[in-house]
Amino acid sequence: MMEEYTFSSAQETVLPLGVKVVSIKMDEGGLIPESMDELLSNWDEAARGARKPFVLYTIPTGQNPTGATQSAARRKAIYQVAQKHNVFIVEDEPYYFLQMQPYTGADSSAVPPPANHGEFIKSLIPSYLSIDVDGRVLRLESFSKVLTPGSRVGWVVGSEQIIERFIRNCEVASQNPGGISQIVIYKLLDEHWGHTGYLDWLINLRLSYTDRRNSMVRACEQHLPKEIASWIAPAAGMFVSP
């Protein structure tokens, strides 16, 4: 299962492998849990010619391409549907740390930035991994959207059994990210910035993306005719979807 609008490369990766993909409806808040539950509850293997779906691929934060961000309440609701139907969740979160300040309108005062690291961390929407009690979540993360786009370095977090299988697959597929990219990021994060420096960078990135988002939305408000166009100010990520 995937959102009805999703990252094209994710589809292009799994379809040649014979994976059957079904889409789940979305709204401005992302994937709709009721739509997912209805699909799974009424699944007819004979009519569909396929077994009941058992994996959900989702981009919860700053979704590509819609820009939608699932709220904490929605993530809990989707996780409960996954528990009900024994579905494994692949949580793709390259934009997780691009969560922005709330959009208050073109003529309103900006929301003050986080005062410290603790306030910044507290402001982040809980991930699926953080609410996982069954070991049914694999979280994908990346430095490509928040640090060095050309590094192509990321990491995965999940249960020991899943990670072991992931490692075995990597040994005969991609093997490892580029060694130069790994050492550059290691030197930056471990020897130069440290945890506090990285958090400072992420806070600065939030403010920068908030300014960019606000400029884009203001331009939409000023120049696009509301009779034929509509948009929602994204809470995270790189996309504004009409």
Tell where the protein language model's regions lie, with residue ranges.
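A structural signal for well-ordered alpha-helical segments within the folded catalytic domains
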Residues: K76, E160, G179-I183, T210-N214, ...
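Short coil/turn segments at secondary-structure boundaries
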Residues: Q70, P102, R152-V153, N169, ...
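Conserved core segment of the aminotransferase class I/II
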Residues: P16, K20, P126-L207
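Conserved glycine-rich beta-strand-loop-beta hairpin in the small C-terminal domain of fold type I
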Residues: L202-V217, E221, I228-P242
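Acidic catalytic patch
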Residues: W43, D92, S181-I185
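Conserved core of the PLP fold type I
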Residues: M1-N86, V90, Y96-I131, Y209, ...
